[in-house]
UniProtKB/Swiss-Prot annotation:
A tubulin-like GTPase that forms filaments, which are required for positioning viral DNA and capsids in the middle of the host cell for optimal replication. The motor component of a partition system which pushes phage DNA (encased by protein gp105) to the center of the bacterial host cell. Also required for movement of phage capsids to the vicinity of the DNA and rotation of the encased viral DNA at midcell. Forms filaments during the lytic phase, which position phage DNA at the center of the bacterial host cell. GTP binds at residues 13-14, 93-95. GO terms for molecular function: GTP binding; GTPase activity. The record marks 187, 190 as: GTP hydrolysis. This is Phage tubulin-like protein. The non-hydrolyzable GTP analog GMPCPP stabilizes filaments, which never disassemble. Its main location: host cell.
Amino acid sequence: MSKVKTRVYCCGGTGMDIGVNLQWHPDLVFIDTCDKNVTADHDLERVFLTEGTRGAGKNRRYMLPIIRPQVPGFLERYPAGDFNIVVFGLGGGSGSTIGPVIVSELAKAGESVAVVCMSGIEATEVLQNDIDTLKTLEGIAAATNTPVVINHIENVNGVPYTELDKEAIFNIHALINLTSQKHVRLDKLDIDNWINFTKKHNQIQPQLCQLHISNNRQEATSVPEPIAIASLFADASREVAFGTPFVRTVGISDVSDPDLLADQLHFVINSIGVASLFGSLTKQKQELEAAQVRYQQRNAIIDIDDNRTDDGFVV
């Protein structure tokens, strides 16, 4: 059986929330550790719940050995596509383990894959998960000798998750469009060599990289030290080369395509931006810890004169 063109794997609570808005794509599926993120809007035929789990409680260390052996069966049920998008949150306990395990399995199998992920900033344990998940993705890149490319949705205090989800939905839609194999001049190997740029340029160290998606050439041009660029143009006469990438590929879209999101789209991969992302999350965690260290431990309201039983009752 031939592969689907673009498979989308939506993992954990973040993946469930984002993916429910993209079910128009026939090759999108969900995986989570409990049913608490499943709503009436989810197509249950696409939902895979891991066995022996009732959520993760943001505990990645607890969850990893439970879900790791279940992912191969999930991938057998929903095989990889020519291109694969893995969607998850960095800061939880389910998606941040399921997602990287899927990425690792796909990378080991030589599949093309990109990640769309969102950080969490609401607690120190969440920020620590963000940090550890990024480190995990860097580790997967080193272990598989393949770059791991993430489109990161930045979580900002005061911005509702619904707004962040909109950015993720647009970016996933854009990636589905890019990898649809329906653009003039853009074939499957062009996409493979763009996302797996170290195949042809082995002087570049495989590591965690960041994918910047924009419908504005000026904005795309501002991405520092671009390694690989893919662009879509609805009007071939507007094609303009920019940046200093190792890899550049271009597709010309059909203006009548209902999936046309903009007259141009640019997908720029670099690695230098990961350092600032990692630094920002680390700084936010340190700021929370600095505030928490000033918390006061109150004195106990029980004292030695209370008539207290061995099991804690005061009578």
